[in-house]
Amino acid sequence: MAKRDYYEVLGVAKNASDDEIKKAYRKLAMKYHPDRNPDSKDAEEHFKEAKEAYEMLSDSQKRAAYDQYGHAGVDPNMGAAGAQGFGGFADAFGDIFGDIFGQAAGGGRGRGGPQVYRGADLRYSMEITLEQAAHGYDTQIRVPSWASCGICHGSGAKPGTKPETCPTCHGQGTVRMSQGFFSIQQTCPKCHGTGTYIPEPCVHCHGSGKVKETKTLEVKIPAGIDDGMRIRSAGNGEPGINGGPSGDLYVEIHIKPHPVFERDGDDLHCQMPIPFTTAALGGEIEVPTLAGRASFTVAEGTQSGKTFRLRGKGIKGLRSSIAGDLYVHVQVETPVKLTDQQRDLLKQFEKSLAEGGPRHSPQSKSWFDRVKSFFE
C-alpha cells in the first residue's frame, strides 16, 4: 500500500509553518495515542503514520528532500515508525508530550512490568577515497560503547548491597495518574521505570550498571556508495533499558576530494591538458580511469573546452548494473619558455596561416565579424 503524503497525514498545507505542523501532530497524537486506544489497531496505525510524518516535516533538511523528491528523497531507515515501534519516542518528541505522558512515551510497557526502552542510535563519521567508494572496501572501526560494570556486575549497586523494590510504583515501573477526563500511565518518577531503586550506588559506574568501552566492528562498504550515504549496523548502538533492544550504529560516509576526478552521481569528470600540436593535428590520447588506462581519439582541429565521453568508464552505482561515464574536458595548452629556434618556427607557422586566409581560424573570423558589425 502506497504511503500517504506527509502533509495530508497531518492535515496541513505544504507551506505550513513549524508551529502549525507541531500543533497538527500533537492533536493527532493525543487522539490516536496507544494509551487512549489500547485495543485499537487502527488507532495504532494512525499514530505511527502521524509520528513518521512529523519526524520528516519537523526536520528542515528532511523536509526539503521530501518536498523535492517525495518519499524517494528520504532515507527509509530514518524515522520509520515500523522499525522501532514506539521506542525512541521520548527522545524525538519529549518537548511535546513530556508534560502529558512523561517518559512513558519513550518505550514499550510490559503487562504490569517496568518500562522498556530502546537504546539510542550512535553516529560515526568515516572518510574514504574515491577508489574505495567505487570498488567497495572492508575495514574495521573503533567506536565507543557500553559494557556491564565489572565492579557491581551490572546491578548498579555498591558491592555487598543490592537494588530494592521501588516503594512508589511497587516494582511496576509505572504509576497511574489522572489528568482531566482521562487516566494515563506514566513512568515512575522515583525509579525512572526500572521498578527498583539503588540506596547505595556503585562508585565506579555511579549506579548505572554500565561503563564506557571501545568496541571494534567490521564495516563492509559496498561498491558505488556516494558521499553522505549511511551504513546501518543493527544493534550496535547504545544498549536498551530494562531489556529493551539496543539502538543502531549509523556510519556516515564522506569521500575525500580526488586529485584527478570529480564525481557526479555515477559519472566522473576530469580536466585534461593536451599539446596544441595534438589539438591541431589530432591523435590518440591516453587518460587514467579508476579501472586503469583508457584511450580515445582527439579529432583534428579540437578546440579548448571540448568534452569527450567515454562510456562505462565511470562508477557502477549501488542500485545499477551499468557503470556511469567518464567525461574528459580537454584544455589546449599553450607552450611556454620557448627557445629562439622555437620562436622562429612559430613565427614561420603564423605567417603561413596568414597566407592561407581565415579558413584556418574560423572562430576568430566569426568573432571579428561580430565586433565589426557592432561598431558599424
Swiss-Prot record:
Family matches, as InterPro entries: DnaJ, DnaJ_C, DnaJ_domain, DnaJ_domain_CS, HSP40/DnaJ_pept-bd, HSP_DnaJ_Cys-rich_dom, HSP_DnaJ_Cys-rich_dom_sf, J_dom_sf
One GO-annotated biological process of the protein: DNA replication
Main location (coarse class): cytoplasm
Cofactor binding summary note: Binds 2 Zn(2+) ions per monomer.
Zinc finger (CR-type) stretch: 136-214
J domain: residues covered: 5-70
GO molecular function, one term: zinc ion binding
Compartment list: Cytoplasm
SMART domains found in the cross-reference section: DnaJ
Residues that, per the record, bind Zn(2+) 2: 166, 169, 188, 191
Per-repeat ranges for CXXCXGXG motif: 149-156, 166-173, 188-195, 202-209
Highest taxon listed in the record's lineage: Bacteria
Binding-site residues for Zn(2+) 1, renumbered to this chain: 149, 152, 202, 205
Any one of the GO CC terms: cytoplasm
Record has rRNA-binding as a keyword: no
CDD domains tied to this protein: DnaJ, DnaJ_C, DnaJ_zf
Co-factor requirement: Zn(2+)
Domain notes from UniProt: The J domain is necessary and sufficient to stimulate DnaK ATPase activity. Zinc center 1 plays an important role in the autonomous, DnaK-independent chaperone activity of DnaJ. Zinc center 2 is essential for interaction with DnaK and for DnaJ activity.
Protein family membership: Belongs to the DnaJ family.
Function description: Participates actively in the response to hyperosmotic and heat shock by preventing the aggregation of stress-denatured proteins and by disaggregating proteins, also in an autonomous, DnaK-independent fashion. Unfolded proteins bind initially to DnaJ; upon interaction with the DnaJ-bound protein, DnaK hydrolyzes its bound ATP, resulting in the formation of a stable complex. GrpE releases ADP from DnaK; ATP binding to DnaK triggers the release of the substrate protein, thus completing the reaction cycle.
Name this polypeptide is given: Chaperone protein DnaJ
Biological source species: Burkholderia thailandensis (strain ATCC 700388 / DSM 13276 / CCUG 48851 / CIP 106301 / E264)
Gene name of this polypeptide: dnaJ
